Swiss-Prot record:
Keyword DNA repair among UniProt keywords: yes
Organism: Lawsonia intracellularis (strain PHE/MN1-00)
Signal peptide: none
Main function: Involved in DNA repair and RecF pathway recombination.
One cellular-component annotation, GO: bacterial nucleoid
InterPro entries: ARFGAP/RecO, DNA_rep/recomb_RecO_N, NA-bd_OB-fold, RecO, RecO_C
Keyword Transcription regulation set for record: no
Single GO BP term: DNA recombination
Name the record gives this protein: DNA repair protein RecO
Keywords per UniProt: DNA damage, DNA recombination, DNA repair
Gene: recO
Length: 249
């Protein structure tokens, strides 16, 4: 079987003298691994486009025994410039990629995740606003794309609109109001501005994942969102960040 798709290169590795192993996020087939035989040498088939984070168009063929995929040819669509020269941006984007790899992306989930990664790519490539919190917020968005999508606007128990402080129950995966706080275990308080940010993360482009312009409010958003997202992802997806890498727990 053979197919064409667009892809972002997540990882690259070499084996033997001229061959390349690639991990790709594709727009229709999810995250895949493939072999590019002659990838280091063939300018005709790969045009020097096999670079980390490059967006490429690929032609992929299943091997005769059906056990692996061969990258037959590829052409460059777009490549990063700022990402490769700014180590902080590069590190933040790679953190998002490593999380995506651990979660995995099926063919069903591929189209929205691919669109999100392209938006994130352009955000890191061209935007100058603060981005340190983006990898944390990205984890919530990916969890939401996987079906773990808390509703942050209304109390999950009584339905009241939350227009002040809410309380998040990690194991239940829900937000409740102050009246219904006894319905959840170990509630974590979260302010209205943080709730608004989490709603934007679920629905909008990374360009809209902006912290408050007020320094004190922004600090509270960072703390509250980081605490809730990391706990939520660990409990429901079984993934934690430890010693510089993501681990399944």
């Amino acid at each position: 079987m053979e197919w064409l798709d667009n892809a972002i290169i997540l990882e690259l590795g070499s084996f033997r003298e001229s061959d390349v192993w690639v991990k790709l996020l594709t727009s229709q087939h999810g995250v895949i691994s493939a072999f590019a035989f002659g990838g280091h040498r063939s300018r005709r088939r790969f045009c020097g486009c096999l670079g980390i984070l490059n967006e490429i168009q690929v032609r992929v063929q299943t091997s005769r025994n059906g056990r692996f995929l061969n990258l037959q040819e590829a052409s460059l669509i777009n490549g990063p410039i700022q990402l490769r020269t700014n180590k902080n941006r590069f590190g933040a984007f790679i953190n998002c990629i490593r999380f995506l790899e651990v979660v995995g992306v099926s063919s069903d989930a591929a189209p929205p995740v691919y669109t999100l990664m392209k938006e994130l790519f352009y955000f890191f490539e061209k935007n100058t606003q603060p981005y340190e919190i983006i990898p944390i917020l990205f984890r919530l968005r990916i969890a939401s794309e996987q079906g773990y999508a808390p509703i942050f606007s209304n109390c999950a128990k009584c339905g009241r609109l939350i227009n002040n402080k809410g309380f998040f129950g990690i194991s239940d995966g829900i937000i409740v109001c102050s009246i219904c706080i006894n319905y959840i275990k170990t509630p974590i308080a979260i302010g209205y501005e943080s709730l608004e940010l989490l709603k934007r993360v679920q629905l909008a482009s990374p360009y809209d994942w902006k912290l408050s312009e007020n320094t004190k409010s922004a600090a509270a958003q960072k703390y509250e969102c980081t605490e809730i997202i990391n706990a939520f992802v660990e409990y429901h997806l079984g993934i934690t960040w430890s010693k510089g890498r993501f681990l399944k727990v």
